[in-house]
Regions:
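C-terminal cap of thioredoxin/glutaredoxin-like
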Residues: 3-14, 20-34, 38, 42, ...
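Structural alpha/beta surface segment adjacent to cysteine/selenocysteine redox centers
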Residues: 23-132, 221-222
Length: 224
């Protein structure tokens, strides 16, 4: 195998299933590399998708957002428990009660794209997901985002200036439009070698099946 496996992950920072999917992908990639010793390391790219693009740039009340989203039935508490249980099984201690602000995720996706240019995208994505789901940090707080960026090697003042600008706003919009035009309407959504897709946070074995298929398939295929 001369070419590395390419993995594109369409995701949003406020989607708990995306964090679960990230952990399952990591486990699948570890198994993949064990099964292909000496092969090139898979290349993972995170692509933006905003589940709630109409939320104001400063975010909105989490409680209000949940109430609006779940009318008239109200929040599905059983589903929330299921997500929390699955997350704990993967070592993710979600603290959803700490989330008071439902953010607009444009700035977080901008930071993700900026980090990609420096080869640190996965670390940035992990830092932002952890901050939101485990600490309740607002992803619209530029000071908090700048602090988080320093944990993966960025300069605080440069990140703060970047977030205050409009740099990469149109890049995020273009990338999101491209995946929506391609038919992506939910996240997480995995694309292996540009042709084999998996929609949803499936088990590791499903992701591995897609990886194997992606190295041999000549046409597009859907797995899971």
């Amino acid at each position: 195998m001369s070419e590395p496996l390419r993995v594109d992950v369409v995701f949003d920072f406020v989607c708990p299933w995306c964090y679960i999917g990230k952990r399952r992908l990591e486990a699948a990639l570890e198994d993949w590399q064990s099964a292909h010793p000496g092969g090139p390391k898979p290349a993972v790219r995170w692509l933006p998708f905003q589940l709630n693009p109409d939320i104001p740039s400063g975010g909105m009340s989490r409680r209000e957002h949940v109430e609006l989203k779940n009318r008239p039935a109200g929040p599905d508490l059983e589903k929330q428990k299921q997500v929390g249980s699955l997350a704990r099984g993967l070592g993710l201690a979600f603290e959803l009660d700490k989330i008071t602000v439902q953010p607009n995720t444009l700035d977080a996706h901008r930071l993700s794209g900026c980090a990609e240019k420096l080869g640190r995208q996965d670390e940035m994505v992990e830092a932002l997901l952890k901050a939101f789901f485990m600490q309740g940090i607002s992803l619209n707080d530029h000071e908090a985002l700048s602090d988080l960026a320093t944990t993966v090697g960025f300069d605080w003042s440069q990140v703060a200036a970047y977030l205050m600008s409009t740099t990469d706003v149109q890049v995020v919009a273009r990338l999101e439009q491209e995946v929506r035009t391609a038919g992506v309407d939910m996240v997480p959504f995995f694309i292996f070698n540009g042709k084999v897709t998996v929609s949803g946070a499936h088990e590791v074995k499903v992701l591995l099946e897609a990886m194997e298929m992606a190295t041999t398939a000549e046409t597009a295929a859907v797995v899971g």
